[in-house]
Amino acid sequence: MCSKRELRMLMLHYSKHGECILQEIGAAFRGEHATDLLLICDGKETVRAHKLVLAAASPLIRMILEETPVLDGVTTVYFPEVQVSYFRLLLDFLYSGQVYVRSVEEYHHLQDLLALLQIKASIWKNSDGSGEGEPRKSEPLVDINRNTEGITGSSVVHQHPSRRRRSKSQDSLSGDSASGGGGTGSQAGTPKKVSVKSERHSAGSSVDGDGDRDREENLEYLDEVEEAIIKSNNNHPLHPHQHHLVAGSGGHHHHHHHHHHHRQLHQIKTRSRRSDPSANRRRSSSDPVNLSIVKQQQDVDSDDANIDVETIGTATTKTLLPPRYLDPFRTKRKAAAYYIHPADAEALKPMDHEGLLHNSPDNYVVTPHRKRRPGFHNSPAQNPPFVPSYLDDLRARSKCFLSAPPTYLPELRPGSPTSVRHAEIAAGLSNNNNSSSNNNNNNNRIRPPSADNKLAVAPFVYPWPTAALAGLPGGPSDLLGLPYVHGGGPNAETSPADLLQQMKNFENSQAELSARASAAGGGGGGSGGNGSGSGGVASGGGGGSMGGNTAVREYRCEYCGKTFGMSWNLKTHLRVHTGEKPFACRLCVAMFKQKAHLLKHLCSVHRNIINAPEAGGRYTCCFCSLVFETLQELVRHLSGHHNNLLLSKNLHE
């Protein structure tokens, strides 16, 4: 800081003001601090930037920000057909003042992006305006790096109205070094990078002879550099391609035609006499193209707030947006960006298929498993009661009906010698022998229909609903086990009263069979009784292979439909669904569904207690002082004498 007193006032001069501002802006861009502009490119890739920086360079961004109300401080602009890599190059160029492009294709895309954002060509093109004021003290560094991949030549040709020199023999330039007004040259044969220093003077109000002489020397020097590069790269094929840069002096604009060789890098640096020596530093790159911002001298009548839109010379402009996006913003040059404000952050995120799953604990259904962790209780609400299906009973008891439908039964054909009368079937149902209930009996076996006899069609019988069948005595399983009986011919009709009488007769016969089987088995229980409380249902039926008078009882689980032959097996199984754990370990308060699991737990987990080293290999009861020689004796002792201590309901006693 330095202070100066002038007209009784103090002026503070911030000598490094611009440098500090640029450093802060660069740090904010690299760290994405205080970003208020979100750019969404192709593939939903995002880039964050600052409105102030982009609005200062792009009239399109400034117009978007002026027309869009700011709600949350962040504005989102969509560029659906612009790759994010090109936008990063543009941001590096706007924030740092220069950018290195590695291919000609990227350079062209960057040019198109500059044109899309309506960025003036004077910002990045080297042009000198003629001013009427005093000469400028210093001018910044201007780097024009040309990538030669796909472009013929890397030289710069200045077309001057009065003079143009390109007559140098290649033989004379093979050993000479090119030198110019700045006293610095580059050899023609060896280097791939040619650095040129030239001295420029700002044009004043009048053009003198010294300025013309210096300009002519610069043109001659550039011609020598061009021919030196052509000499050093004469083996590379040429591809005609031109780029136009706007340059002028004394109010005239001259077009410079650039011819580039394949895979040849050429850099021309133009510096002023009073430029800072620190500006000599350059960043190295394998194949760069460098664009640098040039400070333009503003005209007196120019208005900074009104910036005209200019195109970039004759460079090829590719259509980056579809025509439907060009309607909202139509200026001197048609270019626009589809934007939405404010941004919907949820719409930008990709579809998350895993997020569709509800992770609520209520949606986790625990399947029955015999091995559970100690203390785990399964909620009965998560296990709906099992709804039994009587189709299995129908298949088991009426296998003969599966071979042919009732309309194809030989008993229904009139005049058949093997037909069975209704009276005989009723007598067979009331008979006490077991052969009437056996489906495999040869006397009642139904044979398949023959081809010589005509098929008889049985009359339609109204199907009984499930609720009506369940309300009838005897249970639905017995009704489904009732075989189809028809007493008349094929044209006879059966009344509901006859069907009810047949059902009652079948029910009485089944009751007599069950009573006789229970009496023979020593009071094994009645048919259809409750076998396990509310969790299981016990049912009885005739046993074909169990003997003459032995009834087979089965206990069905209402939750999963499993059947068991003994009630205690069903009772133990129901603990899987209800989560009941009636057995508990007093040593570690672990709970179990079965006593066998608790005894196994005591003999394995607490083996150091029941089989202590000081016991001499014998087993000690953990509840009393008795000692046993074998583990089986200890288990028998725990299960018998200390059975109450194994129950969880007596855990607190």
From Swiss-Prot:
Start and end residues of each stretch annotated as Disordered: 126-215, 234-305, 429-451, 512-534
Main location: nucleus
Molecular function GO labels: DNA binding; DNA-binding transcription factor activity; RNA polymerase II cis-regulatory region sequence-specific DNA binding; zinc ion binding
Domain BTB as annotated: residue spans: 35-103
Superkingdom of this protein's organism: Eukaryota
Compartments where located: Nucleus
UniProt protein name: Transcription factor Ken 1
Organism of provenance: Culex quinquefasciatus (Southern house mosquito)
Gene from which the chain derives: ken1
